[in-house]
Amino acid sequence: MKQILFMDTTLRDGEQSPGVNLNEQEKLQIARQLERLGIHVMEAGFAAASEGDFQSVKRIANTIQNATVMSLARAKESDIRRAYEAVKGAVSPRLHVFLATSDIHMKYKLCMSKEDVLDSIYRSVTLGKSLFPTVQFSAEDATRTARDFLAEAVEVAIRAGANVINIPDTVGYTNPEEYYSLFKYLQESVPSYEKAIFSCHCHDDLGMAVANSLAAVEGGALQVEGTINGIGERAGNAALEEVAVALHIRKDFYKAEPSMTLKEIKATSTLVSRLTGMVVPKNKAIVGANAFAHESGIHQDGVLKEVTTYEIIEPALVGESQNLFVLGKHSGRHAFTEKMKELGYEFTNDERDAVFEAFKKLADRKKEITEEDLRALMLGEAAFAAQQYNITQLQVHFVSNSTQCATVVLKDEEGNVFEDAATGSGSIEAIYNAIQRILGLECELADYRIQSITQGQDALAHVHVELKEGAHQVSGFGVAQDVLEASARAYVHAAGKLKSFIQLVK
């Protein structure tokens, strides 16, 4: 049975989702979780895009030990050399070079002839191969490319040294039958086909990204590309967790097994959702809140008698816990540390102490601490520790009618303390106005969302905000049992990012 490898592009293609803006620390958190998920290749970013992207890719490359780290590059020497500088420190570095091959792209975007495109492919892959042990070539807009020319371009790339050939459905145009036949066509028409691994990369514009990816596997693809939760530009990418579980459950049909640690799927999905602020729909396959819920009386009766009557996936397969009690206020530092290690977290003594302190505070107010609570605490404290500013004091007072007054005290990384107060028509508006006064911002609150992480009156709150000032838009999140504290943390998280961006462009 063939093993299907996964190339995750959450950190590059996924981050291109409108409204998503991850900082370096957040990208590193996701990269570490992708490593736990067993992802074979992670596309850490586009190193030549900006200095920030370069530094993020470089840090991930120097950190990850058990996965290939890849940078995207155009078919340009400067891009390729920049990608090399970013990932050369990786245990397993890879270059991902791309060039469009469809008539519409060659005519209107590239203004290049077919001969020019073939020459550029050969030169860029040859250069890449002189620097990297592994080179992946993508024929952008492959599914709208004339098949004979696509086969010619692929052959040129393989002869130049490409180890992996990606056939992307860049605009989500194809369907499963067409995509399957395209892979079969290339198998028959590319003389050097056996010298490379073929990969698929599907977008979801027509809602067929997962189905198309599975069809590609049937057609001979050995690598599937996509993102966690299917996030990405426009309608998004193929959701890797859906492809992986489909291959596992229907290995009898696909004759393939996913190379992924499936029990880490839920934790990965939750992390990506909270850091990006993109809420997972309740009815989403595999990771949605209702994925394993049954309301129909007939269904409930069947499941109680025999679970396989209406469930084809065991929740535990993807790491869906039953949210059972795991720790309490009497749990000590050692038990806490061991449980966090069991969940896959590694941290320094200082980081452990900060999260343990937050855990003890929560345990004093919450009778049962679940795995979801622990993950949320770890996420929240990691974000809090990485911020330019942290909240040291927060007070809200009723003034009159609906007017509230908030006093906020912030401390920066150098230990400087800032305090200010402001009013607003409600507690949250007052808090946000006070924070704006401290940071000297005049931004617009573009989005505010609150989620309960676990059930019950003592549940942790997760608040996501998006701030906009001029052309700059950033997101932030905060986790706390108190909604006002979570809201303040989220605003400080986002406002700190926004201030950094504004200072950078100045």
UniProtKB/Swiss-Prot annotation:
Biological process terms in GO annotation: L-leucine biosynthetic process
A cellular-component GO term for this protein: cytoplasm
Highest rank taxon of the organism: Bacteria
Major enzyme class: transferase
Annotated Pfam families: HCS_D2, HMGL-like, LeuA_dimer
Requisite cofactors: Mn(2+)
A GO MF term: 2-isopropylmalate synthase activity
Keyword entries, A-Z: Amino-acid biosynthesis, Branched-chain amino acid biosynthesis, Cytoplasm, Leucine biosynthesis, Manganese, Metal-binding, Transferase
Domain Pyruvate carboxyltransferase: 4-266
Role description: Catalyzes the condensation of the acetyl group of acetyl-CoA with 3-methyl-2-oxobutanoate (2-ketoisovalerate) to form 3-carboxy-3-hydroxy-4-methylpentanoate (2-isopropylmalate).
Name under which the protein is recorded: 2-isopropylmalate synthase
Organism whose genome encodes this protein: Bacillus cereus (strain 03BB102)
Phylogenetic lineage: Bacteria, Bacillati, Bacillota, Bacilli, Bacillales
